[in-house]
Amino acid sequence: MESLASLYKNHIATLQERTRDALTRFKLDALLIHSGELFNVFLDDHPYPFKVNPQFKAWVPVTQVPNCWLLVDGVNKPKLWFYLPVDYWHNVEPLPTSFWTEDVEVIALPKADGIGSLLPAARGNIGYIGPVPERALQLGIEASNINPKGVIDYLHYYRSFKTEYELACMREAQKMAVNGHRAAEEAFRSGMSEFDINIAYLTATGHRDTDVPYSNIVALNEHAAVLHYTKLDHQASEEMRSFLLDAGAEYNGYAADLTRTWSAKSDNDYAQLVKDVNDEQLALIATMKAGVSYVDYHIQFHQRIAKLLRKHQIITDMSEEAMVENDLTGPFMPHGIGHPLGLQVHDVAGFMQDDSGTHLAAPAKYPYLRCTRILQPGMVLTIEPGIYFIESLLAPWREGQFSKHFNWQKIEALKPFGGIRIEDNVVIHENNVENMTRDLKLA
């Protein structure tokens, strides 16, 4: 395998090319990219956890250091001012020397407010990309050049096409997340609480709870019916029925986003339904290829959901086609089939059809779908179908012409299990689809 250093060198060359194109198109001289700043909790001197600007970490794997600045013009070596204060109160990251520092000019920045004296004097034609517009104004950046929409749309669109360096980082993130999922399943099987399962996951991945790319969803029993359940009960459940884990990891700023669901027993209807959702998810991935709309795969999975609802007699006396047409599958899978993945968990440009930012919204029938792109080589997406038993979504169907088709007794029996979600991360290649998750033998 090519070294990360050589992959990074090619990655920077790609980013430089994209930057040249964007600067030419929007008549700018350079981009000033800000890592971000710490923001204090209201009426407190304690800051919120730092989250780096994703456009910053696209260039350098510096994810924990505020007050850093990148100046890029697509031609000269990128210049990084790395915040290096004299501070005995807080940990100070040393000036980096790593696989990537040969390709970036790294300069120590001892004072956060010292950046102004180090930037080019002429700043009227520099674009600022970052979370603190008032800082850009203080530095003399034109208001019209602060987070310019055209530039950001352009950069976001091409972020969909991952470089080999980015794919290498994402495969490493997968390994970490897979370790976490295995540890969490073991903790579940031993009867631990959600809180303790989460600790086991974080320990196995080497993350703090502020390091993971999103809040871990550690859901036992009926909690699996809450799509983004993040409460974490401290008490172990008296009866373990089911466990849904949606949790990822991050490597050099790139995310993994995996979900698995386990049944406590292997011989009940719920366990069979978990197996069937898993099989249908793999079957869908086997059909995926470049040149097809992501929306098509979402719609196809609703047809697969209909097949499972019929097989398990959750919906009866209705064809699979009629179930999808009348949206009887909707309350059982109330989210999209997945989303783009990369520097962000819900990565950018899911609706962009070109580098001008042309927006194609999700279909009216499926407004929660996060991607309407035609799949192309280099894209990374999640495939995460589910079946849930959510009373607020089922309640409207308890009356009306379709109520008789719902096997309410079966649904009541399944509600204590919450739901099921199975999520893999896939890469679209020219002639195949790589399943990064299954390649690591995560069942």
UniProtKB/Swiss-Prot annotation:
<dbReference type="GO" id="GO:0008235">
    <property type="term" value="F:metalloexopeptidase activity"/>
</dbReference>
<dbReference type="InterPro" id="IPR036005">
    <property type="entry name" value="Creatinase/aminopeptidase-like"/>
</dbReference>
<feature type="binding site">
    <location>
        <position position="423"/>
    </location>
    <ligand>
        <name>Mn(2+) 1</name>
    </ligand>
</feature>
<dbReference type="InterPro" id="IPR022846">
    <property type="entry name" value="X_Pro_dipept"/>
</dbReference>
<dbReference type="GO" id="GO:0102009">
    <property type="term" value="F:proline dipeptidase activity"/>
</dbReference>
<comment type="similarity">
    <text>Belongs to the peptidase M24B family. Bacterial-type prolidase subfamily.</text>
</comment>
<dbReference type="InterPro" id="IPR029149">
    <property type="entry name" value="Creatin/AminoP/Spt16_N"/>
</dbReference>
<keyword id="KW-0645">Protease</keyword>
<dbReference type="InterPro" id="IPR001131">
    <property type="entry name" value="Peptidase_M24B_aminopep-P_CS"/>
</dbReference>
<feature type="binding site">
    <location>
        <position position="384"/>
    </location>
    <ligand>
        <name>Mn(2+) 1</name>
    </ligand>
</feature>
<dbReference type="Pfam" id="PF00557">
    <property type="entry name" value="Peptidase_M24"/>
</dbReference>
<dbReference type="GO" id="GO:0006508">
    <property type="term" value="P:proteolysis"/>
</dbReference>
<keyword id="KW-0482">Metalloprotease</keyword>
<comment type="function">
    <text>Splits dipeptides with a prolyl residue in the C-terminal position.</text>
</comment>
<feature type="binding site">
    <location>
        <position position="257"/>
    </location>
    <ligand>
        <name>Mn(2+) 1</name>
    </ligand>
</feature>
<protein>
    <recommendedName>
        <fullName>Xaa-Pro dipeptidase</fullName>
        <ecNumber>3.4.13.9</ecNumber>
    </recommendedName>
</protein>
<keyword id="KW-0224">Dipeptidase</keyword>
<feature type="binding site">
    <location>
        <position position="339"/>
    </location>
    <ligand>
        <name>Mn(2+) 1</name>
    </ligand>
</feature>
<dbReference type="InterPro" id="IPR048819">
    <property type="entry name" value="PepQ_N"/>
</dbReference>
<feature type="binding site">
    <location>
        <position position="423"/>
    </location>
    <ligand>
        <name>Mn(2+) 2</name>
    </ligand>
</feature>
<keyword id="KW-0464">Manganese</keyword>
<dbReference type="GO" id="GO:0005829">
    <property type="term" value="C:cytosol"/>
</dbReference>
<keyword id="KW-0378">Hydrolase</keyword>
<dbReference type="GO" id="GO:0004177">
    <property type="term" value="F:aminopeptidase activity"/>
</dbReference>
<dbReference type="GO" id="GO:0016795">
    <property type="term" value="F:phosphoric triester hydrolase activity"/>
</dbReference>
<feature type="binding site">
    <location>
        <position position="246"/>
    </location>
    <ligand>
        <name>Mn(2+) 2</name>
    </ligand>
</feature>
<feature type="binding site">
    <location>
        <position position="257"/>
    </location>
    <ligand>
        <name>Mn(2+) 2</name>
    </ligand>
</feature>
<keyword id="KW-0479">Metal-binding</keyword>
<dbReference type="InterPro" id="IPR000994">
    <property type="entry name" value="Pept_M24"/>
</dbReference>
<dbReference type="GO" id="GO:0046872">
    <property type="term" value="F:metal ion binding"/>
</dbReference>
<dbReference type="Pfam" id="PF21216">
    <property type="entry name" value="PepQ_N"/>
</dbReference>
<dbReference type="InterPro" id="IPR052433">
    <property type="entry name" value="X-Pro_dipept-like"/>
</dbReference>
